[in-house]
Swiss-Prot record:
Site (Important for activity): 46, 135
Source organism, top-level taxon: Bacteria
Residues passing through the membrane, by range: 27-53, 62-87, 91-113, 118-144, 151-178, 194-227, 258-287, 294-319, 325-343, 348-372, 380-407, 411-430
Induction field: By L-fucose.
GO molecular-function term, one example from the UniProt record: fucose:proton symporter activity
Protein name, entry field: L-fucose-proton symporter
pH dependence per the UniProt record: Optimum pH is 5.5 for fucose transport.
Function: Mediates the uptake of L-fucose across the boundary membrane with the concomitant transport of protons into the cell (symport system). Can also transport L-galactose and D-arabinose, but at reduced rates compared with L-fucose. Is not able to transport L-rhamnose and L-arabinose. Binds D-arabinose with the highest affinity, followed by L-fucose, and then by L-galactose.
Primary location group: membrane
Gene Ontology annotations of biological process type: arabinose transmembrane transport; fructose transmembrane transport; fucose metabolic process; fucose transmembrane transport; galactose transmembrane transport
Membrane-protein topology: Multi-pass membrane protein
Cytoplasmic side: 2-26, 88-90, 145-150, 228-257, 320-324, 373-379, 431-438
């Protein structure tokens, strides 16, 4: 592609020789594939949760800890990933993330063979560490591949592939995992002999092998393509790092930036709310709708992903025409209202409200992210790393919601937790609205 860079201040890809904007179609397409791939891993967790809950006899709280193991990997990796990218490049962070992703997924084969729950959790942790690298690199990279003014649009466009990956993951998981071995009622399980029960539970676990081996192959293929593709270098990679100083100096500067601090809190709440809502949606349906099975309830989970996908398209269109923080405020307020309906109405009404809520979650993550890293300049890498670290919210809010549901004796009451999270996001959006014109 020639001698290229992305300016730190304007965040615009240019050709040094021609002095004109360049179109990085192939790099952008490969970056979009990463958004697809990490959506697959994230949303397969919502399939694994009810599968492991029956196979390993877990309570709602214990099942929520699956997300804790997963998101802890997200929590610890962004800072090391940011340091790696500072010393090398965004591309190095992406390749590292893909290899970790493949390694973690590969562990599912031996874990299923020996039916070792701990090894599954280790695999999920490693997958999440890889995804943390990918998100730390890809999210800011997408925002700087062009004019800063259209960074929100590019990130939301890339996140559309994330929504598509979420739909594929649920359909993929439903057909190859949940439907492969039908879940049995407790009455049926009680009538099984110890040998039959053991064989049945092992069959539930073995059903995850094929899907995750397919994932390993695809991830390694994408890693190879990225290794062979030339990506534009960021000017900060080559010129600004000397001025950036130490990690502590960067953190000190970031701590004084109010919109970044709010973005960290808002993103923690968003990931927590989204993960909790999706993780317990199948349980919500089974508990609230008489005769509902986990396999059929997965159709509602697919519906949430379709709503998410549609919401992403409409949200991206709205953001191209209205101020991003105003669209975010409206979406957060509607999502909060739908969670409250699911908490107090229950039944089919609550389930439909919970399904529709995903349409209004759709643009929240990328919009919070792009608002949070705006004007961070030389601190963009570390600033984005901290925002990615807030994904630990999915590992904290989910078990909290599980604990509340166990204590209340039902899932709907626990929907008040994500409603509270969306209220915080609404406050963040209003904060952005008040300061955007100052």
């Amino acid at each position: 592609m020639g001698n290229t860079s992305i300016q730190t201040q304007s965040y615009r890809a240019v050709d040094k020789d021609a002095g004109q904007s360049r179109s990085y179609i192939i790099p952008f397409a490969l970056l979009c594939s990463l958004f697809f791939l990490w959506a697959v891993a994230n949303n397969l967790n919502d399939i694994l949760l009810p599968q492991f809950q029956q196979a390993f006899t877990l309570t709602n709280f214990q099942a929520g800890l699956i997300q804790s193991a997963f998101y802890f990997g997200y929590f610890i990796i962004p800072i090391p990933a940011g340091i790696l990218m500072k010393k090398l490049s965004y591309k190095a962070g992406i390749i590292t993330g893909l290899f970790l992703y493949a390694l973690g997924a590969a562990l599912f084969w031996p874990a299923a063979e020996i039916m070792n729950y701990t090894l599954f959790l280790v695999g999920l942790f490693i997958i999440a560490a890889g995804l943390g690298c990918l998100e730390t690199a890809a999210n800011p990279f997408v925002t700087v591949l062009g004019p800063e003014s259209s960074g929100h649009f590019r990130l939301n466009l890339a996140q559309t592939f994330n929504s598509f990956g979420a739909i594929i993951a649920v359909v993929f998981g439903q057909s190859l995992i949940l439907s492969n071995v039908p879940h049995q009622s407790q009455d049926v399980l009680d009538k099984m002999s110890p040998e039959q029960l053991s064989a049945y539970k092992h069959s539930l676990v073995l059903s995850v092998q094929t899907p995750y081996m397919i994932i390993v192959a695809i991830v390694l293929l994408v890693a190879l393509l990225i290794m062979l593709t030339k990506f534009p270098a960021l000017q900060s990679d080559n010129h600004s790092d000397a001025k950036q100083g130490s990690f502590s100096a960067s953190l000190s500067r970031l701590a004084r930036i109010r919109h970044w601090r709010w973005a960290v809190l808002a993103q923690f709440c968003y990931v927590g709310a989204q993960t909790a809502c999706w993780s317990y949606l199948i349980r919500y349906a089974v508990e609230e709708i008489p005769g509902m099975t986990a396999g059929f309830a997965a159709n509602y989970l697919t519906g949430t992903m379709v709503c998410f996908f549609i919401g992403r398209f409409t949200g991206t269109w709205l953001i191209s025409r209205f101020a991003p923080h105003k669209v975010l405020a409206a979406y957060a307020l509607i999502a909060m209202a739908l969670c409250l309906i699911s908490a107090f109405a229950g039944g089919h009404v609550g389930l439909i409200a919970l399904t529709l809520c995903s349409a209004f979650m759709s643009i929240q993550y990328p919009t919070i992210f792009s608002l949070g890293i705006k004007n961070l300049g030389q601190d963009t890498k570390y600033g984005s790393s901290f925002i990615v670290m807030t994904i630990i919210g999915g590992g904290i809010v989910t078990p909290v919601m599980g604990f509340v549901s166990d204590a209340a004796g039902n899932i709907p009451t626990a929907e008040l937790i994500p409603a509270l999270c969306f209220a915080v996001i609404f406050i963040f959006a209003r904060f952005r609205s008040q300061t955007a014109t100052n």
